[in-house]
Swiss-Prot record:
Membrane topology classification: Single-pass membrane protein
GO cellular component, one term: plasma membrane
Biased composition regions of type Basic and acidic residues, renumbered to the chain: 124-145
Post-translational modification: Phosphorylated on tyrosine residues.
Name of the gene this protein is made from: Ptprcap
InterPro entries registered for this protein in UniProt: PTPRCAP
Native source species: Mus musculus
Protein name: Protein tyrosine phosphatase receptor type C-associated protein
UniProt KW keywords: Membrane, Phosphoprotein, Transmembrane, Transmembrane helix
Places the protein is found: Membrane
Listed transmembrane segments: 33-53
Oligomer status and interactors: Interacts with CD45/PTPRC.
Amino acid sequence: MALPGTLRFGVLMALPGALASGADPEDGVGSSVVTIVLLLLLLLLLVTALALAWRRLSHASGGYYHPARLGAALWGHTCRLLWASPAGRWLRARTELESPEESGPPEDEEDAEDFVIDGGPEEAAAKEEEQRCQAEQTRDPRDTDSDGGLGLSSQGPVGSGSSAEALLSDLHAFSGSAAWDDSAGGAGGQGLRVTAL
């Protein structure tokens, strides 16, 4: 069943070349227009396939890969990197010196704006949970070994900055453990092997 699909794809890929090679020199303008139209149709087909694949992935993951969520995460990461940079610290210090009496809108107004902008109670609750998790992580970053862990901490080497922290926080989605048995029913089996990811 895969052969007809592969055959169709091969014909589709070879069609612009075959049309361009069989043309007369006087007919060069017409064949280039046909080639461009075919390439644009191929591009449209690829974009449509990408959109359908993304929609299926988003539906299967419960919206985890939605562009709004990914964009918000990327924007938050960019803002954290900006504020951690020397230019961001300088900008923050400068704005604090210029207007210390203006503290901005009260928190209740900010929460109401976030609730309206974010689109509802589900997303607001998710953002609150995310902020609470970040606050717990930043509250006691040096005490990671007290939980009985493997001695791995989210702090990188001295001077590594926020890029190492961002890398380790991105790896959180891949954490877990696995167990398997390599023995094929033989008497010399060693039992289950366990690894932590």
